[in-house]
């Protein structure tokens, strides 16, 4: 075997793009990845398919004189989006698309694994092909199911996300938080229904919910440090069945975004306080359910990230860009809360489309550029 060429990598990416699958359903993707990996040089490579997370793959490249294990993660799932790119290798699965660029992510990981299977690294390298990033918290599942134990426990962890706003092949990163953490909000306001003409005999949940919504909006402006960033969006409200009956139940659904886990927990506490206050004021029951799952803020480790940025800045072949944090979520944040590491951007040069767009069309030249930059950093990191 030889290291996968740029031409071969592009063909791999195009095939992966044709077979997108949703979270925990990535069977065809998994089988194709496994086929490619098994065709690589196996002398120093151990491949594991965990029974507890069967669409995941762990690939461990044994180092020459290992002092540590460096982890590299890629996600493998797709989104329920109908593709509208018109590409000759468009999705073969109706209503499903790699609209977040995970086909690019996987291809870069395969390129790195291909190189290090042929060129044995100094330290151990762990490659984690992770299912269910877009939903179902695949990273958290992997951790809780014990995938990262023994020789598969990384001392530090890295991962990338493609960014259509950045020039193709560029690398973007920052100290601190790269992605916000997210928490789902579900609130049930329960009162007593009644005739619209006799409000004194009912407990109106619509009025209570309306005031609750307004009070929640004060949390960011009055309970959070204005230098920090946080968002509470309540995107769905359901109440009542007919115009002349006071609603006995109102459902509110929304999301929290915060740049640190500390901030998210602070918002959680204030939400509960506000709900309790509305319940008391309007004589209703207010049940608050918060679900963060594995979507913690992606908080880059200071020491490791400083080293990463320093390398990328001094490498004349890398177009490095200091970036701002994004309020979108990424479940690699959970793993970075367990293992020190860094997440970074790979520019894919499609500024006309956003992530999760049905027209996302990454520039394939970014694949080899990304591999070269990351490969160089990993070699430098191992000393």
Curated annotation (Swiss-Prot):
GO terms for biological process: diaminopimelate biosynthetic process; lysine biosynthetic process via diaminopimelate. The active site is at residues 75, 134. It catalyses: N-acetyl-(2S,6S)-2,6-diaminopimelate + H2O = (2S,6S)-2,6-diaminopimelate + acetate. InterPro entries: AcetylDAP_deacetylase, Amidohydrolase, Bact_exopeptidase_dim_dom, Peptidase_M20, Peptidase_M20_dimer. Its EC number is 3.5.1.47. It is an enzyme of class 3 (hydrolase). Keywords: Amino-acid biosynthesis, Diaminopimelate biosynthesis, Hydrolase, Lysine biosynthesis. Pathway: Amino-acid biosynthesis; L-lysine biosynthesis via DAP pathway; LL-2,6-diaminopimelate from (S)-tetrahydrodipicolinate (acetylase route): step 3/3. Transmembrane segments: none annotated. One of its GO terms (molecular function) is N-acetyldiaminopimelate deacetylase activity. Pfam families: M20_dimer (PF07687), Peptidase_M20 (PF01546). Catalyzes the conversion of N-acetyl-diaminopimelate to diaminopimelate and acetate. Belongs to the peptidase M20A family. N-acetyldiaminopimelate deacetylase subfamily. HAMAP family: DapEL. NCBIfam families: amidohydrolases. This is N-acetyldiaminopimelate deacetylase.
